[in-house]
Amino acid sequence: MNNFLKMLTPVLLLISLAACSDEGGSRQEADDNIEIYTTVFPLKSFAEQIGGDSVDAHTIYPKGVDVHTYEPTQKDMIDFAEADLFIYTSDEFDPVAGSIKNAVGGHSEFLPAADIIEKDGLMAHDHEHDEHEHEGHDHGSTDPHVWLDPVLAQSMAEQIKDKLIELNPDEASTYEENYEALAADLVDIDEELEQMTADTARDSVYISHESIGYLADRYHFEQVAINGLNNDEPSQQDLTRIVDSIEEQNIKYILYEQNVTSSITDTIQSSTDTEPLEFHNLAVLTDEDDEDSTYQSLMRENISILGQALND
């Protein structure tokens, strides 16, 4: 983060100059659409579905990036400052968002959509790897992947709906209607997950990175993660225990995520004759994803993958 902090001073100067050159009109006055930036993809998807034609939503993350190591450029920071709204999960879950807010705060509105979630609804980090030094953004002791739980995702979608109504009350009825359609889809996904996990051949899912804790908790299966929340690698003792467990249970699949690489997982997979299955953590899209992908479409693909891992 040192390089990121060093660039804040010139960024703030550029933002101030851009503000001075603005002839007194806001972006919203020049363009009726609400300009939105988000961190993880689900927030962008929800903003687009609720806001419809009245919003232009973008995610800050390039396709396929590992969000643990992403840092915005100076140009990115200026774009964020010119937006009407910046949506992120929370200061704890999105450390990069906190840095962006410190740099451009006062130029854009910021919505921490996951702040509505009660503390007792959050998952503590329970991975028992030895401590390792690693670069990037440390998510601390709480699992940030709240969006993978469709019930918690609905709470965040409602926060986005309320903020859009605040910014553009003339479209309130449209936002309410669009939110209700989205909420109905999220209820359906919750029910599909409940049904899929009601009676399974296995009770554990092996995955390359600790990211499905909320799904495991709500739908009553065990997550066995090879790398921790911040991609910290397992100790030799943990590694041996994981390999032994895979062989004892005759596990057939290890889930890989679309934007996270793990050489340790590759080694385990090849040494245990398990097959890789791609699980989409939804944090970012990749070049392989359809341009019209939504939270719902990706989660339904995940339901199929989880069903395969829990039943084959």
Task: Describe each PLM feature range.
Residues 4-6, 20-312:
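Extracytoplasmic metal-acquisition and chelation regions
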Residues 1-18:
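Sec-dependent bacterial lipoprotein signal peptides
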